[in-house]
C-alpha cells in the first residue's frame, strides 16, 4: 500500500547536499529531488490504469502525435509543427480504429495545446482516452466510478482521499447533475438564458464549478446541443447532447460523449467551428477528410478523455499540476 507523499525525500536530499559541502538552497535540482515520492506514485498510477483497462479487455494503442488535421474547436488551439500539428487529443485517430472494427481501445499519451498555462493547465500534458463500441455516455459514468475507486483503493487502501482540506468520498452513489439543474441551482438562470446572454462559460466557471465534486464526484451531464462538440444529440430531446464532464474538488477531470457517427452532421459542425476560428482571427486547420469518411463505418460508441496530471494532483493532494510533473515548462 502506498502512503501519501510527504517531505521525507526532500529532507534526505537536503541532508545529502549538506554532507557533501553543498549549499542546500532550493535550486531546481533540489526541487526536482523533492518530487520523488509524487513521481513514484504517478508511475504506479499509470501502471494501475493500464492494468484496469487490460482486465476489462481494452486494447492499448498508440496513434501519431504529429497529425495533418486536428479537430477544429473554437476554444482549443493546436501547436503548429511545420506543415502539421501536434495533437490536442488522439480522438480522431482512435475513432478511425473503431471504424476499422476495434471494439475497445485505450491510450495514455502526450497532448499539446497552445497558450494553455495555469495551476491546472500545461501546454504539454498527459491524457487518458478510452472508447467502447455499442455503449453510451451512461456506461462511461459507471466506468469512471470503477476506475477511480480501483485506483484509490489500490494506492491507498480506501475509497476516500483528502484534497485541499476536503475529504472526497469515492464510494457510490456519485452525484449526477444535469447542466440545466446546475445553472438554476448555482447560477441563478437557465441554460437558455445563459446562452442568449453569451455568459455560459463565465457562469459555469465562476458560479457552478466551485460547487461540483466537493464531497463526492459529480457528473455534470446533458449539455446544450450548441456545445455538443463531437457528441450526438439526445433522440428524445435534440436540444441536448449526450455529453458529461466529471468534477472532483471543483476541478474538471474528464469529458465524455456518446459519439456522433453521422458524417454529414459532423462535417457541418466542423464547418461552423472553422468559421468561428476565422471570426476570431485564427487560421483554420486543414480539413480532416479521412476522419469524416471513416465515420460512415463507425458503430455507435462512447468515448472519454481524462486528464492524468489533474488526476495525480487530486490523488496526491497537490495544489498545482506543476507539482506532479518532473519538468514544468518554465524549468526547461
Residue locations for each model-derived region?
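TRNA-binding/sensing appendages of the translation machinery
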Residues: 13-79, 306
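Short, low-complexity, intrinsically disordered N-terminal modules
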Residues: 9-10
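Alpha-helical scaffold segments that mediate packing/assembly in large oligomeric complexes
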Residues: 155-192
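Short amphipathic C-terminal alpha-helix that caps PH/PH-like domains
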Residues: 141-151
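Short amphipathic alpha-helical segments with heptad-repeat character
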Residues: 39-43, 47, 131, 138, ...
Amino acid at each position: 500500500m502506498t502512503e501519501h507523499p510527504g517531505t521525507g525525500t526532500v529532507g534526505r536530499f537536503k541532508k545529502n547536499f549538506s554532507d557533501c559541502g553543498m549549499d542546500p538552497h532550493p535550486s531546481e535540482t533540489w526541487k526536482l529531488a523533492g518530487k520523488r515520492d509524487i513521481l513514484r506514485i504517478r508511475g504506479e498510477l499509470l501502471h494501475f490504469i493500464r492494468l484496469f483497462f487490460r482486465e476489462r479487455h481494452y486494447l492499448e494503442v498508440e496513434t501519431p502525435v504529429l497529425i495533418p488535421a486536428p479537430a477544429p474547436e473554437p476554444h482549443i488551439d493546436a501547436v503548429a509543427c511545420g506543415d502539421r500539428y501536434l495533437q490536442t487529443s488522439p480522438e480522431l485517430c482512435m475513432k478511425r480504429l473503431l471504424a476499422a472494427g476495434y471494439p475497445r481501445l485505450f491510450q495514455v499519451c502526450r497532448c499539446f495545446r497552445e497558450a494553455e498555462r495555469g495551476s491546472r493547465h500545461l501546454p504539454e500534458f498527459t491524457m487518458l482516452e478510452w472508447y467502447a463500441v455499442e455503449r453510451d455516455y451512461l456506461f462511461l459514468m459507471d466506468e469512471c466510478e470503477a476506475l477511480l475507486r480501483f485506483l484509490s483503493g489500490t494506492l491507498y487502501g480506501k475509497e476516500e482521499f483528502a484534497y485541499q482540506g476536503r475529504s472526497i468520498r469515492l464510494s457510490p452513489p456519485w452525484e449526477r447533475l444535469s447542466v440545466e439543474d446546475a445553472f438554476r441551482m448555482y447560477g441563478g438562470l437557465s441554460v437558455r438564458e445563459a446562452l442568449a446572454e453569451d455568459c455560459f462559460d463565465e457562469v459555469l466557471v465562476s458560479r457552478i464549478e466551485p460547487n461540483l465534486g466537493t464531497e463526492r464526484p459529480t457528473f455534470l451531464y446533458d449539455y446544450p446541443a450548441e456545445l455538443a462538440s463531437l457528441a450526438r444529440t439526445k433522440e428524445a430531446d435534440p436540444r441536448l447532447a449526450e455529453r458529461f464532464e466529471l468534477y472532483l474538488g471543483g476541478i474538471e477531470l474528464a469529458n465524455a460523449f456518446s459519439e456522433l457517427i453521422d458524417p454529414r452532421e459532423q462535417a457541418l459542425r466542423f464547418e461552423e467551428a472553422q468559421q468561428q476560428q476565422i471570426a476570431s482571427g485564427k487560421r483554420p486547420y486543414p480539413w480532416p477528410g479521412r476522419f469524416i469518411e471513416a465515420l460512415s463505418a463507425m458503430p455507435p460508441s462512447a468515448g472519454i478523455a481524462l486528464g492524468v496530471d489533474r488526476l495525480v494532483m487530486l490523488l496526491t493532494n497537490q495544489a498545482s499540476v506543476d507539482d506532479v510533473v518532473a519538468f514544468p515548462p518554465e524549468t526547461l
